[in-house]
Amino acid sequence: MRVFRRFYQVQLPPISKFRLLPQYKLKCGLEIHTQLDTRNKLFSMSTNDPFHSANKPNSHTSFFDIALPGTQPILNHEAVLFATKLAIALNCQINLDSQFDRKHYFYGDQPLGYQITQHFSPFASRGHLPLHKDIDGIDEISKNIHITQLQIEQDTGKSLYRKSDHITLIDLNRSNVPLIEMVTEPDFQDLKQIRAFIKKYQNLVRHLKISTGDLETGAMRVDVNLSINDHARVELKNLPNTSSILNAIKHEYLRQVQIVEDGMADELLSQPETRGWTGSSTVKLRSKETTIDYRYMPDMELPRITLAADVVETLQKTMPPLPDKILNTLMSEPYKLSLKDAKILCLSSNGQDEIYNHEELQQFYLDTFHSYADRVKGNIEANKLSKLPTNWIIHELLGDLNKLELPLSEITKVLTPQIFADFLMLIHNNEISSASGKLLLFHVLKTLKETNCDTSTTIDFNSLIDEFDIRTINQIDHDELREICNEIIETLNNDKLINDIVTGKKKKSIKFLVGQGMKLSQGRIKAQDFERTFKEVLDVKW
């Protein structure tokens, strides 16, 4: 059998045909390493900026980072604060008396010869992160993913292999960067749960402002532990992004299923092993027989982390609402946003080169909504209150800001929520059409960019409306409007289109005619008036 095992090759179907089989139960857990976005490194005063300093290797290093003999670690308390926030958000039990330990191994990018971590007494444990069907898109109504533990530890340096010279270079800018390692229980049973958890955890650390959460830059790194039908656990590494994580799981699941069906489970799935992801398959890195003995021992140069219970309680009370709570608020009265729109207001970016952040956008939306709602109360149904603020902020304003590369924080110095509510009232009162409103808003934003959002700039929408002659014509002669509609139909000279509209075969095509009318009138005649007149001219019965 040993000879057979040596030459055995697993033949797999393409992962595009992946599906979970009921007779082979997936059991999966995650280990996520998150770089903390502190000002300084974990045990030194070096600047913590490994991503932006990548083109300047070894520029952010201290004597301790390079393991100069005689140097000692000094704990960065900001990292402890960040870890406490995450532990609270993950509903963990915080260890008020945790300690640091040394994990010994020798590698070029670990100059100390050991990593400072928390093996014997981790910072927090026994937490959970809830997933919900209506928010996170899982199949179950709700599911708790249990957190085994959180531990604070230091990151390693970075090894860079230069193929042309056959040498490995070491960059220690990342050495001693603070990490939190979060370990889950093996609660995941399908890919939807795994995808939802990773997205939710990533958004959480961004929301708490403790990490950029970027997978691509290594600020968040995910290892996967999985097995089928309670066979030995396989750990998957080298997973740079979400698609790699999911594809590696698919491939490994299919590999293990095929091994069981080939009768090779006792030979190949009886011992834990670590496998790497190549981009198309998993390859063996090491098995239990070759597992490193890390010789853990307490770090005697660092005192224990002793926290007072009242400090944790105070932090818990003063933390801002978490994303799920904000989502539920936005989807409830009086806002009644769709999940998609609410998520736009809640999903945090990585903070790099952003046009807006979720806090700024949320506040601008809420202030605009309430200013607008106070003016139209009693004149509009409650469930329609959010329609204009949502459409014009989330869809129009953000689109224009992206086109102009104009930060929201800059334009709000002049275009305040109250002034934006004035603009919405012009549309609500049919002073201008939506088409004219889009042109007017873009013009205002472009002007703000050209003046560098000078706070002395005043925005007078009514003057601009008169200047560009785009005020809606509310009283138009009916015969004149019929004449315009007839002229559009004759100019188009498209009998098939007209017939499809009249017969009801393509009812939505009437919107095309309306669009032509809006274009011809420069948006000054309401779309409803055009649609009603076109139906009258064509004698539409539907």
Curated annotation (Swiss-Prot):
Assembly and binders: Subunit of the heterotrimeric GatFAB amidotransferase (AdT) complex, composed of A, B and F subunits.
Protein name (Swiss-Prot/TrEMBL): Glutamyl-tRNA(Gln) amidotransferase subunit B, mitochondrial
The protein's enzyme class: ligase
Catalytic activity: L-glutamyl-tRNA(Gln) + L-glutamine + ATP + H2O = L-glutaminyl-tRNA(Gln) + L-glutamate + ADP + phosphate + H(+)
Assigned GO CC terms: glutamyl-tRNA(Gln) amidotransferase complex; mitochondrion
Stretch forming the transit peptide: 1-66
Biological process annotations from GO: glutaminyl-tRNAGln biosynthesis via transamidation; mitochondrial translation
Family: Belongs to the GatB/GatE family. GatB subfamily.
Enzyme Commission number: 6.3.5.-
UniProt cross-references to PROSITE patterns, sorted A to Z: GATB (PS01234)
Keyword Protein biosynthesis: yes
Alphabetical keyword list: ATP-binding, Ligase, Mitochondrion, Nucleotide-binding, Protein biosynthesis, Transit peptide
Pfam families named in the record: GatB_N, GatB_Yqey
Subcellular location(s) per record: Mitochondrion
GO molecular function terms listed in the Swiss-Prot or TrEMBL record: ATP binding; glutaminyl-tRNA synthase (glutamine-hydrolyzing) activity
